[in-house]
């Protein structure tokens, strides 16, 4: 029968703890790799679905051209993602091949985003703006900058607005028009 000294047992346990740390509260097993790539995953899934729906040939050149044209219509965080990928005219780097090559063999968007994260961590740091339900929020309690942002997200602008009440009145006036197309407004 083999008996280890207490020091050896403590050293062994410490080694196990370092090599396999215990998850702390709030931490998820496996780190849920896709949880932080929401913009990338959503965008690439929508892009892939559009290619499938239109019956596009999955060659590298075709996917690259389609991705660049798909990025022309993007706004906000998705436009920023296109910039990071190099699919916009003003992009500094071009890593489109890191999307087109895996997509040509029908790799899932989540796996593509994980690979992109290794190249540029900013890609997975993108998050969609929280959405605002105009029916449940009191516009009078919001800041003017937030009210301007609502109008900007609708593509509207108030040049004659001098006070906060002007912005509130304009948003309430335009809300039925945009509530039909956008049930929730980005804030």
UniProtKB/Swiss-Prot annotation:
It is found in: Secreted. Its main location: secreted. Disulfide bonds join 37-124, 40-113, 71-82. GO terms for biological process: dopaminergic neuron differentiation; neuron projection development. It holds the Pfam family ARMET_C. Induction: Not induced by endoplasmic reticulum stress. Widely expressed in neuronal and non-neuronal tissues. In the brain, highest levels in the optic nerve and corpus callosum. Transmembrane segments: none annotated. GO terms for cellular component: endoplasmic reticulum; extracellular space. InterPro entries: ARMET-like, ARMET_C, ARMET_N, SAP_dom_sf. Keywords: Disulfide bond, Growth factor, Secreted, Signal. Residues 1-24 form the signal peptide. GO terms for molecular function: growth factor activity. It comes from the Eukaryota. Trophic factor for dopamine neurons. Prevents the 6-hydroxydopamine (6-OHDA)-induced degeneration of dopaminergic neurons. When administered after 6-OHDA-lesioning, restores the dopaminergic function and prevents the degeneration of dopaminergic neurons in substantia nigra. Belongs to the ARMET family. This is Cerebral dopamine neurotrophic factor. The gene is CDNF.
């Amino acid at each position: 029968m083999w008996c280890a000294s207490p020091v050896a047992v403590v050293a062994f346990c410490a080694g196990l703890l370092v090599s396999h740390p215990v998850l702390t509260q709030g931490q998820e097993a496996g780190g849920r790799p896709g949880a932080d790539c929401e913009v990338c995953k959503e965008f690439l899934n929508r892009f892939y679905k559009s290619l499938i729906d239109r019956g596009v040939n999955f060659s590298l050149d075709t996917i690259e051209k389609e991705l660049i044209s798909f990025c022309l219509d993007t706004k906000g965080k998705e436009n920023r993602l296109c910039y990071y990928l190099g699919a916009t005219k003003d992009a500094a780097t071009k890593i489109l091949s890191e999307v087109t090559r895996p997509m040509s063999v029908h790799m899932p968007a989540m796996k593509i985003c994980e690979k992109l994260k290794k190249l540029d961590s900013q890609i997975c740091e993108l998050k969609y703006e929280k959405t605002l339900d105009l029916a449940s929020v009191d516009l009078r309690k919001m800041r003017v900058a937030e009210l301007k942002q609502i109008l900007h997200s609708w593509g509207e602008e108030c040049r004659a607005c001098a006070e906060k009440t002007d912005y509130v009145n304009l948003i309430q006036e335009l809300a039925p028009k945009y509530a039909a197309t956008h049930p929730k407004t980005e804030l």
